[in-house]
Amino acid sequence: MNIQIVTVGKLKEKYLVQGIAEYLKRLSAYAKVSIVEVPDEKAPEVLSDAEMKQVKDKEGVRILAKIPDDAHVIALAIDGKMKSSEEFAADLDKLATYGKSKVAFVIGGSLGLSEAVLKRSNEQISFGRLTLPHQLMRLVLVEQVYRAFRIVRGEPYHK
């Protein structure tokens, strides 16, 4: 399985870089995983609704340009469907079983994802109703993908 994680902005925090690198190393035994960063749109601290939409739309164009046409797209969205780790694992396994070898996860910037990206997605998931920094979501996502592969293969993983 080829998994692409498309994210907005550059990762700056050293502890996140190290954590993600560790899980990418572990994941290499199960799948080819790549992270693609697209530039975030510079914006003032306070934005009108129209300005927020404009920022998300510009970031959305950049995101969509990086997603392969034949990829199954999973957008991480606050209003997405919540799943347990076991459900997430089963869903990834089904994708592999039914020939979806390319999966693209999308993590938006601090304002979220554009309507165009949400429309392009095949599904939207949420890891909870908490608001987490989008950069931290990268680490959470790669950990959950790793956990999913361990669950599917019946391999032990601490709870």
From Swiss-Prot:
Keyword DNA-binding: no
Keywords on record: Cytoplasm, Methyltransferase, rRNA processing, S-adenosyl-L-methionine, Transferase
Enzyme class: transferase
Highest rank taxon of the organism: Bacteria
Residues reported in the UniProt entry to bind S-adenosyl-L-methionine: L76, G108, F127, G128, R129, L130, T131, L132
GO cellular component: a single term: cytoplasm
GO molecular function, one term: rRNA (pseudouridine-N3-)-methyltransferase activity
Keyword Cell inner membrane tagged: no
Protein EC: 2.1.1.177
One Pfam family, short name: SPOUT_MTase
Catalytic activity: pseudouridine(1915) in 23S rRNA + S-adenosyl-L-methionine = N(3)-methylpseudouridine(1915) in 23S rRNA + S-adenosyl-L-homocysteine + H(+)
Localization, UniProt: Cytoplasm
Function: Specifically methylates the pseudouridine at position 1915 (m3Psi1915) in 23S rRNA.
Protein name: Ribosomal RNA large subunit methyltransferase H
Organism in which the protein naturally occurs: Listeria innocua serovar 6a (strain ATCC BAA-680 / CLIP 11262)
Lineage of origin: Bacteria, Bacillati, Bacillota, Bacilli, Bacillales
Gene designation per UniProt: rlmH
